[in-house]
Amino acid sequence: MSFKPKNSNAPRSNNSGENTGLFPVPKGGSRKARVSLIVDLGEQNRPDFEDEKTGETKPQKPCQQVAIFADLVNDTVDYGGTIGKQHYRLLLNKQFAGEITGINFMFVPPKDAKGKIIDGKPWTLHPANLMTKLAKAVNKPDIIESGDIEQLLDCPFMAQVEVKEKDSGKQNDKGEPIIYRNVNYKGCSEVPLDDDDEPMQVAELNTPAQCITFQNAKPDDIKFIRKKLIDMIKLANDYSGSNMEKAIKEYEASLNAANDSNSEQEQQEEEKPQATKPAKKPTKKVQEPTPDDSEDGNEPW
């Protein structure tokens, strides 16, 4: 199976993480990684393009976008809950103020240094596109022309990771300062060679690499997609009637059913008659510490 841009076979004309300190974080610097998850975000509307030199704005056509993740295989962290200890999963998309930017997934015509379209050459992924840079880093340059980014899955590379710390001005229940840590992907490079001129060993993934598209999505796949990305997917122009819509609706329905079942069970426990006990002498009540509920519930996995 392959996953290519929608316009890979289209007629062509050459006429001119936020993480907040409440979640575990990896080490910064150059980290060994493998591409672990590709998520189809569908056809997304895009904001107008503004020319930095002239200030002129031009409308941009909607285009297919994706999100790409890599697991840092030397950075095992404890996410807690049902996830437990896993390799740190790093989002490669750009993020700003908590908002995620989709990666444009489309072919573009080749241009010269002056921006003029070159006739007779094949359309490819954009030279500055993250997927183009990844294809070079994993030594699979054919992906740039074929557009089959599913070939990136499980490929090893070196991820440049930036970890920034900021004091929140708050304290936890132990009186310790809460430090916010923002994790950002800054680029990629090839795995370096060892003394025998062979690529250094990169550990395998803990979980199988996946490519979740609007065509192959299943309800069980949706648990791997972050809520913010699900919200983006729901805004896609081609979401309605897609297999992705069906999978998300079934997944969310199963979550709601599980929550309703848990609520009913808790209510039944509360309604059970309690055995009366002899009255005890009043004792001084010790105030329980207030739990920290400041997490936004958007797990980084």
Model-inferred region functions:
Residues 1-301:
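Short beta-rich binding modules
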